[in-house]
């Protein structure tokens, strides 16, 4: 440690270019501009959003399935009750699945619709197959982790007694983020600013 700082040079556009990650690498290595693929991974299959069985109210529901390697794919096929898809030579290796994406993904899409989101998540997590819920906002703020982390803050606002807003994700040990005051009304602090900061007397204000 030198005890000396240094200047950090970072542009917003640079971060966007860096976030291209595998897509950027694909282009730089091959010289080919990748086409649109929605939320599907260009280099890994299956790695995308799938519709699952509807919610109790009949609305559509989804999860993301992120099978990162051949071992995880075999485990997924076991969980899905389709071990034959793990043994099918068209789908054994990831490079095969990428090549045959057009036939495999529709098969998986139908399989995924046979079970609910909670059922899939529990089974896949138990098998250590990467996956994740796609939640609406009601589900986000009902999530036990979101609640335990205090991601909803309550404000006493003149126009709404209990105003709930999204809290700061920063949890600072020594100087925690304060939420003592709600966003001010238009002109709420005009007199205070003119009087205390600019020295205007009541008559001038």
Task: Please give the residue ranges for each predicted region.
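Active-site-adjacent "lid/gating" segments in soluble enzymes
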Residues: 1-67, 74
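Conserved active-site and cofactor/substrate-binding residues in soluble primary-metabolism enzymes
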Residues: 7, 41, 45, 67-71, ...
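Short, surface-exposed loop/helix-turn segments at secondary-structure junctions
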Residues: 26-34, 143-157
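Aromatic-enriched alpha-helical interface/lid elements that frame and gate functional surfaces
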Residues: 46-127, 131
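Residues within well-ordered alpha-helices
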Residues: 72-73, 120, 136, 142, ...
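Conserved PLP cofactor-binding pocket of PLP-dependent enzymes
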Residues: 125-146
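Flexible, small-/acidic-enriched active-site or ligand-binding loops
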Residues: 156-204
